[in-house]
């Protein structure tokens, strides 16, 4: 049974049991700082289990793309070398949110495995938590699994409820027993059943885990029943496919077999059992899906994990003899295997290929040199690679530590990781010393959330419900003190979604607090940061909160145009454009987006044309609040990987429709004018556009016009005729430059003739060292050519001094380079004038900063040549 059939049968089975099919969420969890990557199917439902989110369904099923390559799941060195270690894998799952429980979950598991997939029941066994009699009875009495094949697992991890069969989301909160289903590969495979001393063998392989969240664990370790128990299950697709396809290793299943064959093709490797091919096949899945989900190789966070995986794959290709970029060519093979199940992979194939190719080209520039250093370090029979060598490979040649460790492991050598960490910390300490900063203490607020009225009003009557000084709650702020004010109602927008927080004033009679920024303390609690400029502000005071209207209006213009620009970027550059970050304030909008090449001038003009056309249309802006499902049906653009609540705000502005909680203009015409003022790259595969609107855009054009008028006046030309006048001036400049060069040639010839008489003959070589007056580098070279031609066998040094800096050139005729080298000669002189240089044996150049040493240096040339001739 193909992997595609396994996916399809799983989803259809649970759909027939009343489950809603939910699409795989991105590998980057939305708004979850505790996770680097989505590592299980339940991640996208975490807030549902915690009671912080509601869904329009109580039963769900999905096939979730997962990644484990960091933190406690960092088994990267095992990937490709064992039968079941992967970076990327797929998790089949079904969930109940307070609906069905143990009986249905286990009965359906058995039905799917034995009836739909056709696994023999006598090859399956299960584990249950030792105190979970209910699950034990379901297995033995209702499903009919013999008691000897239902294994009770106790607290085997050193504490109460610390067990392989008791699941906890965290130290406190939802938890409960679980029941795992294992497949017996047969007695010809080494290993014992779960719970036995030999359980780590490969005979019994876990394929499905049913977690029953029925308790709430308190801090003291006691548990009480949850009001609505839930079910969370997960089954690894690759493990199930291996069983259904009659193979023992996951790397032998259909999808991996195709990718391994492709890796062999691109590396010219015929032995398809080579572990390096398995590494490459695994890593193309992980890296391609990461790019599709917006993770670009970089030197920090998720981007660095991506870089580590890519470079590990490249190194294994290099090990197989591939010395040119190859890895990116596997994307098309991956799309053939998984594109139907994951349409985004197919849609983004070209961009994925380009990103991987760019990273390959970058690493191949340093890979060979780095491998030479690493091979040399290992050649002496060392047992441990020094930490400073590992750090040099990391810092200079881009070798992640685990890549160096991989190479060392193959040679039976360990890495001094402590030494590496010390070298890394030394570099970080230097960086910290160069740019120290002070971080505010976190503010803790336990009161009710505030009401935000800033969509409709810029002023609001409010009550002070919280005050903070240096991060600590206080009852009052005195004049001159900096602090944070919390109000029960506020028109101030708190920084979110790239839009900066509002500024303004909180005031009462004889009292004023200047708001310099507004930040969220919690999702629904806004902190007004600023300084008490007059009187004393107290908790409980009745105040008026007033936003700086001009600043808000300018910020709204820039935020609104960002939406229209985003749409124009996708239209002009392609649908692959994804927002990677933004900053919207009163001065400008700064928008980072996924794109592999600089945006051309012509493309910028087209983007400006489209955006300004939307502004001129002066259409109404419409904001609607609706549930997330309805919003999706409207076709509103959702930021990939962003986490949205049960209700969202859909913003229609011009022809753009996005989810956004920011503040915006009422009509597109309120934006006034749009101009792109900057385009640059901020990381591999990420571009940045900066743009201005309204009065700032008008000022930009007025300044530009003033510059044009000034230039026209200087050139005595009407502004409209400035371009042809400039062309005329440039032609005149070129003519003058040609005349100057001709004069320099005559001067060089004249000076050369004068210098001929100064040459002295030393052992058959005519030696000349002289300083030329008013000569530039070009004149020195021209004069050198003239002298070499006339002196025949010669060694010559010419010098010039301009603005206190010394320019040197040394020339040796071809018949004399066997005795005298121009590079050595010019360095001899340069060292005496505070400089250095180099070049070919017949011609070399140098510079210096100490002109006072030049006479003696030139005088010493004859003796230097005499020693070598």
From Swiss-Prot:
Binds 1 zinc ion per subunit. Zn(2+) binds at residues 559, 563, 660, 664. PROSITE patterns: AA_TRNA_LIGASE_II_ALA. It is found in: Cytoplasm. Its cofactor is Zn(2+). InterPro entries: aa-tRNA-synth_II/BPL/LPL (IPR045864), Ala-tRNA-lgiase_IIc (IPR002318), Ala-tRNA-ligase_IIc_anticod-bd (IPR018162), Ala-tRNA-synth_IIc_core (IPR018165), Ala-tRNA-synth_IIc_N (IPR018164), Ala-tRNA_ligase (IPR050058), Ala_tRNA_ligase_euk/bac (IPR023033), DHHA1_dom (IPR003156). Consists of three domains; the N-terminal catalytic domain, the editing domain and the C-terminal C-Ala domain. The editing domain removes incorrectly charged amino acids, while the C-Ala domain, along with tRNA(Ala), serves as a bridge to cooperatively bring together the editing and aminoacylation centers thus stimulating deacylation of misacylated tRNAs. Belongs to the class-II aminoacyl-tRNA synthetase family. This is Alanine--tRNA ligase. It comes from Herminiimonas arsenicoxydans.
């Amino acid at each position: 049974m193909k992997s595609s059939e396994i996916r399809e049968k799983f989803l259809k089975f649970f759909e027939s049991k009343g489950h809603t099919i939910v699409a795989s969420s991105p590998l980057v969890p939305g708004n979850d700082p505790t996770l680097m990557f989505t590592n299980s199917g339940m991640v996208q439902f975490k807030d549902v289990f915690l009671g912080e989110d509601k869904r329009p369904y109580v039963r769900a099923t999905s096939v979730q793309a997962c990644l484990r390559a960091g933190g406690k799941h960092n088994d990267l060195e095992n990937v490709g070398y064992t039968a079941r270690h992967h970076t990327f894998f797929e998790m089949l799952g079904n969930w109940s949110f307070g609906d069905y429980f143990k009986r249905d979950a286990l009965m359906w598991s058995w039905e799917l495995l034995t009836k739909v997939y056709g696994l023999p029941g006598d090859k399956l066994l299960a584990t249950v938590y030792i105190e979970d009699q209910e699950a034990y009875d379901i297995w033995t009495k209702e499903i009919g699994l013999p008691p000897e094949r239902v294994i009770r697992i106790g607290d085997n991890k050193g504490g109460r409820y610390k067990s392989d069969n008791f699941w906890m989301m965290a130290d406190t909160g939802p938890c409960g027993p679980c029941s795992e289903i294992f497949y017996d590969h047969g007695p010809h495979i080494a290993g014992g059943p779960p719970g036995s001393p030999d359980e780590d063998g490969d005979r019994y392989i876990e394929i499905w885990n049913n977690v029953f969240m029925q308790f709430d664990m308190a801090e003291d370790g006691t548990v009480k029943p949850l009001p609505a128990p839930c079910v969370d299950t997960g089954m690894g697709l690759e493990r199930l496919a291996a069983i259904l396809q009659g193979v023992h290793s996951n790397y032998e299943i259909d999808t991996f077999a195709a990718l391994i064959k492709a890796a062999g093709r691109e590396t010219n490797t015929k032995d398809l059992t080579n572990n390096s091919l398995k590494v490459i096949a695994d890593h193309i899945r992980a890296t391609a899906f990461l790019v599709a989900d917006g993770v670009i190789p970089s030197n920090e966070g998720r981007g660095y994990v991506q870089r580590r995986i890519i470079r590990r794959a490249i190194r294994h290709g290099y090990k197989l003899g591939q010395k040119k970029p190859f890895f990116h060519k596997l994307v098309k093979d991956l799309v053939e295997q998984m594109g139907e199940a994951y349409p985004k992979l197919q849609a983004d194939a070209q961009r994925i290929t380009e990103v991987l190719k760019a990273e390959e080209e970058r690493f191949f520039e340093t890979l060979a040199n780095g491998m030479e250093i690493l091979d040399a370090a290992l050649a002496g029979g060392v047992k441990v690679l020094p930490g400073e060598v590992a750090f040099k490979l990391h810092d200079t040649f881009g070798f992640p530590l685990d890549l160096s460790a991989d190479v060392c492991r193959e040679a039976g050598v360990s890495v001094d990781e402590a030494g590496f960490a010390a070298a890394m910390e030394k570099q970080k300490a230097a960086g910290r010393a160069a740019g120290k900063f002070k971080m505010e203490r976190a503010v803790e607020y336990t009161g009710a959330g505030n009401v935000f009225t800033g969509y409709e009003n810029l002023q609001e009557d409010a009550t002070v419900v919280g005050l903070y000084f240096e991060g600590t709650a206080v009852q009052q702020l005195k004049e001159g003190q900096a602090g944070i004010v919390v109000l029960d109602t506020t028109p101030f927008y708190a920084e979110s979604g790239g839009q900066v927080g509002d500024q303004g004033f909180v005031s009462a009679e004889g009292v004023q607090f200047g708001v310099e920024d507004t930040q969220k303390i919690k999702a629904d609690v806004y902190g007004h940061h600023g300084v008490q400029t007059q009187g004393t502000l107290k908790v409980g005071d009745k105040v008026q909160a007033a936003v700086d209207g001009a600043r808000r209006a300018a910020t709204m213009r820039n935020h609104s145009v960002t939406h229209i620009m985003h749409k124009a970027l996708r239209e002009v550059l392609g649908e692959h454009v994804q927002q990677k970050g933004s900053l919207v304030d009163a001065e400008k909008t700064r928008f980072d987006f996924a794109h592999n090449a600089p945006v051309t001038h012509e493309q910028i003009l087209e983007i400006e044309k489209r955006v300004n056309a939307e502004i001129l249309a002066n259409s109404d802006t419409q904001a609607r609040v609706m549930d997330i499902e309805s919003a999706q049906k409207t076709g509103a653009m959702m930021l990939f990987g962003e986490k949205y609540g049960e209700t969202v705000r859909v913003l229609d502005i011009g022809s753009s429709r996005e989810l956004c909680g920011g503040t915006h203009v009422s009509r597109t015409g309120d934006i006034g004018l749009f101009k792109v003022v900057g385009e640059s790259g901020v990381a591999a595969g990420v571009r940045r556009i900066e743009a201005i609107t309204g009065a700032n855009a008008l000022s930009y054009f007025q300044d530009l016009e003033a510059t044009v008028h000034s230039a026209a006046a200087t050139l005595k030309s009407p502004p409209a005729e400035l371009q042809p006048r400039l062309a005329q001036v440039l032609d005149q400049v070129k003519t003058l430059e040609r005349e100057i060069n001709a004069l320099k040639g005559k001067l060089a010839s004249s000076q050369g003739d004068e210098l001929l008489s100064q040459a002295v003959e030393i052992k058959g070589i005519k030696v000349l060292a002289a300083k030329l007056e008013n000569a530039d580098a070009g004149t020195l070279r021209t004069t050198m050519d003239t002298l070499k031609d006339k002196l025949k066998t010669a060694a010559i040094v010419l010098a010039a001094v301009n603005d206190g800096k010394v320019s040197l050139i040394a020339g040796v005729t071809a018949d004399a380079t066997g005795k005298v080298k121009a590079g050595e000669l010019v360095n001899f002189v340069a060292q005496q004038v505070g400089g250095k240089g180099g070049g070919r044996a017949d011609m070399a150049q140098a510079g210096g900063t100490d002109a006072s040493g030049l006479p003696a240096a030139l005088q010493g040339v004859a003796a230097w040549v005499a020693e070598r001739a």
